[in-house]
Amino acid sequence: MKSIKKALALLIVLTMVFAFAAPVAHAKARTTKIGVGLYQDSGAAVSAVKAYLANLEDTLNVKFTYTVLSNTDEAQNITKVQELIAAGCDGIIITMDMGTEAILQECADAGVYCAGYLCDFDSSFRTNYDNVFKNELFLGTVADGGCADEARRGYDFFDSVIEYNERTPDAPIRHVAMTVFPAFAFPYQQSFAAQFVEKVEEYNAANPDKAIEVDPLSDETDILMFRPMDSTYFSKHPGIDAIVSICSGSFVYPTMVSAGVSNTMKLFAAGYNDGDEAVFGSKGAYQMEIVSPVEAITYPLVLLLNKINGAQFPDQPAEAERRGSSVLIINSDEDLAKFQHSIYLSFKPEDAFLTPEDVVALTAYNNPDATYAGLVEILDHMTIDDIK
């Protein structure tokens, strides 16, 4: 993080120098309005995103307005984008690849730019590339961690289980089961489950005396249709020590509590929910959580602001890109202590990886030395170890 902070500090200084040396096109005289279509309307991540963006408003002369998109209803997403356009938004950030081509047509009719966040737009990338990624109104997207062709989420879960076993050699995990969301909404979660199994099999071959048993995914109990896990899960998977929930732990932990196993069984999960810290690590069932840094939204935001203000980077790609970002992986009490000083948990702007001045320095319309490569680089420096 020190290297990125030094680079940003230099960009800030250069921005100030150019500001005094010659007229620079700073933010528009009128306030730029950006619409943000999130995947839900509440929760820690939503609160953190809003806290981060609210802290940027005065410095960037931007106003943010919010709506909620659907991962199953294309018509709803189109309607929500129409509402953002009608509200006067100059640019829109969306978190769902559902109805994207139609959304871009709405943007074209209104002269509004669009970019993505927390989504790799894999469906559009694979089946509709020309109409989305080559569309001049779509500026690119930053994924939730890695993009589909580079994601290693299953390996992250494996690493966390092994780290737990090394930390607690007297009570290691020897038998696990998994949960995922349905493939129609999250097509790569079963691939992540396969990654996890692959690593376990490699580990077992090298460490037969420490072998870990993994139950195969059951269509009956393990694919959670966006509702809490059924209590029959435990009869389907008798004798397990832990659950690897590649989908959100919030769909699993309440069932563990009601079944009376939350004090004896461990949970490795994606996502973070309010209050999880009270039952994390040495305090309870949760032993791992993975969250995306909310500051990654800086990538689509800067791309939008550059376009709206008539600027672009000298190294701007000819076509929109999808980029992965680092993630916050919380594996221990020590990691949790760091996480409590992130904006994701504190909602305090001063705990963000980037200040408003950092973001200004990343924009081409404020800083002639800003580059696309510099914007992409910040996405790699938002891990648990970067929290100081």
Please tell me what each predicted stretch does.
Residues 59-71, 178, 201-224:
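Short beta-strand elements in bilobed, periplasmic/extracellular small-molecule ligand-binding domains
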Residues 31-60, 65-79, 95-98, 181-191:
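Extracytoplasmic "Venus flytrap"
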Residues 18-30:
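Sec-dependent signal peptide cleavage junction
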Residues 53, 78, 82, 91-114, ...:
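Hydrophobic alpha-helical
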Residues 65-163, 175:
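Acidic/His-rich segments in extracytoplasmic proteins that coordinate ligands and/or metal ions
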Residues 131-177, 226-227, 271-277, 293-309:
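Hydrophobic alpha-helical segments within soluble ligand-binding/sensing domains
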Residues 303-388:
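Hinge/cleft segment of the Venus flytrap/periplasmic-binding protein
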Residues 262-334:
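Flexible loop/turn connectors
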